[in-house]
Amino acid sequence: MGQIFPRSANPIPRPPRGLATHHWLNFLQAAYRLEPGPSSYDFHQLKTVLKMALETPVWMCPINYSLLASLLPKGYPGQVNEILQVLIQTQTQIPSHPAPPPPSSPTHDPPDSDPQIPPPYVEPTAPQVLPVMHPHGVPPTHRPWQMKDLQAIKQEVSQAAPGSPQFMQTIRLAVQQFDPTAKDLQDLLQYLCSSLVASLHHQQLDSLISEAETRGITGYNPLAGPLRVQANNPQQQGLRREYQQLWLTAFAALPGSAKDPSWASILQGLEEPYHTFVERLNVALDNGLPEGTPKDPILRSLAYSNANKECQKLLQARGHTNSPLGDMLRACQAWTPRDKTKVLVVQPKKPPPNQPCFRCGKAGHWSRDCAQPRPPPGPCPLCQDPTHWKRDCPRLKPAIPEPEPEEDALLLDLPADIPHPKNLHRGGGLTSPPTLRQVHPNKDPASILPVIPLDPARRPLIKAQVDTQTSHPRTIEALLDTGADMTVLPIALFSSDTPLKDTSVLGAGGQTQDHFKLTSLPVLIRLPFRTTPIVLTSCLVDTKNNWAIIGRDALQQCQGVLYLPEAKRPPVILPIQAPAVLGLEHLPRPPEISQFPLNQNASRPCNTWSGRPWRQAISNRTPGQEITQYSQLKRPMEPGDSSTTCGPLIL
């Protein structure tokens, strides 16, 4: 067979699922007639349309391209509309073609014609398929078969019997594309069919060639050799096409393939939709029936006889047992498979037992149906309580914190609830309340996160002190607005030489206002609940002195929370409060005094000292005399420190 090439992609686009191959070949041949030729995107769009149209296959029995074109959305991308128009024109032109005149017999030739000169070539009758237009409008040229071409053709006809419509449409398309010679057709037959089918085809072809040579073929010269030899000449296009037509006609006498299932074995499933069952029948008949065999009577008969009982009852009730296929599809279109009926197995109910329950000691029920829980076999291994299992031990459940009062809930800086307390390092078992962050001594805790309660009946106004760096600080009443992107200040707060820039502000109603200016000078705003001022690099200036608004740029630096209480009360600013219980990490470190050399006599415990020397020393105190008392001051012990820190007490 020559050099073997690797298997490549199929040169013929594959049809969508559910569409017969010979119908798909009609779409392909119509697409090849377009100028410029179709692209892969056009075939993708065509497949998408056909997949949607196959859900209502009424346009296929018989096939109606005009009805399919009406289902196409307006302005659909690709050349799908052009392909359908070609099919519609061809479908209307096929019945109007006159029958070709019978070929003239050699006995009716004029007496003055020279038998050595062949008669002029007459174009043979085109097959009942769409012609394929090759690139640039040139006629097809002969191309020898390649292994990848033969493999692609065999893959297309692998499920079809020789002589079936799908088989013949694929072979016709391949013949029109490659324009093969007699030798090429013989190679194709040996590659596609078995030896028995090839032998039967050869016998049928010989009889057709003998009949054609006797009848007379346009362009055939008996002195130049048999028709098979003259068809191998690439220059004899007319004779080669005649031979190709005879080669295709010889498939009509071939038997069907024995591997195809019988038509009677294709049955509708219990839950299979009716149109899917009819489509399976249609594809099976296309793949197995010889070309020219009427398919509609067989399809109508099998569509009723092989349907399930429910669809047969619907068709009988509407009188569509042998109606056109479109009426049968409409009759069963609304049918849906019923759910499988569940058979309930009725079991006799056992009488209640007379014996007492092993769990509660009462009669009338079994222990598995007892309402009393099963007692544990022993005490709980965690708390030694014999009344519950280990999985129900209270120690395994997290402690539910008590709800905080309403006032405490407003203080957002209170310690967070964590499951485990914080242990201090060598702190004698002391614990510290968990906090969100460490409060520094030099930082005011009231400036961290304020909660501002507002009255719903009043506007959220607040007094603020504004310092514009060009004039003295002034106190104004500003509006808190979380919907304003920038802070707005009246122009009266700025001096006359303040540089201002023109800008436009888009209001909430969509109107643009131009009486606002933009300043790039830093502005300091002091709020009553914040000790450090807010620094704004720029803000809007109202030239009409109507608005003083604190926007999101200032509120974001405060990190404040606006709170709307339920009860009406005057607005109160709640500052941040420190926790009521402070841990040792919040206190300053105790003083450390060097104790070396250590006085063993002075480091005795205080309870061993007598009061008499102290009274005598205090009563006989002389000016400038210092009495030193050593008291034990406990401090957190450091690693490796076993001494006691003592501090002098000056009286």
Swiss-Prot record:
**Which keywords, in A-to-Z order, does the entry hold?**
Aspartyl protease, Capsid protein, Eukaryotic host gene expression shutoff by virus, Eukaryotic host translation shutoff by virus, Host gene expression shutoff by virus, Host-virus interaction, Hydrolase, Lipoprotein, Metal-binding, Myristate, Phosphoprotein, Protease, Repeat, Viral nucleoprotein, Virion, Zinc, Zinc-finger
Q: Which GO terms describe its cellular component?
A: viral nucleocapsid
Instruction: Report the EC number(s), separated by commas if there are several.
Output: 3.4.23.-
Where are the catalytic residues? D481
Residue stretches making up the Peptidase A2 domain:
476-554
The record ties this protein, via PANTHER family, to: ENDOGENOUS RETROVIRUS GROUP K MEMBER 24 GAG POLYPROTEIN-RELATED (PTHR40389), IGE-BINDING PROTEIN (PTHR40389:SF3)
In its miscellaneous comment, the UniProt entry states:
HTLV-1 lineages are divided in four clades, A (Cosmopolitan), B (Central African group), C (Melanesian group) and D (New Central African group).
Q: Give the protein name, as stated in the record.
A: Gag-Pro polyprotein
Q: Which organism is it from?
A: Human T-cell leukemia virus 1 (isolate Melanesia mel5 subtype C) (HTLV-1)
Its gene is: gag-pro
